[in-house]
Amino acid sequence: MKFKIFILGLLICFTSCKDEVVKKEKEPLIMVEQSEMSLLMNEMFAFNESIKQQIKDGKLNNDFPEHFNKIHTAVLTDSTVRDEAFKKDAQLFLDAQKALFEVETTEDLKMHYNNAVKACISCHEVTCVGPVPRIKKLYVK
């Protein structure tokens, strides 16, 4: 009899100590809208990827996209970033990018293109460092 009571007690103990699984509702993911500058930077990256391929093929088929000048006015994710250093770096990038479309030889194209990539990296080393590894992939070797 004592044994049956002992077994019954163990059963009650084990069944009452069961962890109840409470299902938590997953919070919906909130997509953050990209800033105007972020969208422009992504477009610049894609454009420069195509330029890289054109340089490898030996001929540049594009013109400078004038809307890249919006780098000076596009709304930033963090508005405090637009300081004098940012303005200077943005202009250096634009100058290097425009120089691409004024050269004659493939070697000059490569040099000016890599200068434009270098201008991107120098700015991104100070501001918004996240994309630096991605930008480095743009170099023409």
Where are these regions (language model features)?
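Sec-dependent signal peptide recognition
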Residues: K2-L8, D19
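C-terminal motif of bacterial Sec signal peptides marking the signal peptidase cleavage site
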Residues: C13-S16
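Sequence context surrounding c-type heme c attachment/ligation sites in exported
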Residues: K18-K141
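A periodicity- and composition-biased signal for non-globular, repetitive helical segments
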Residues: L8-L10, D63
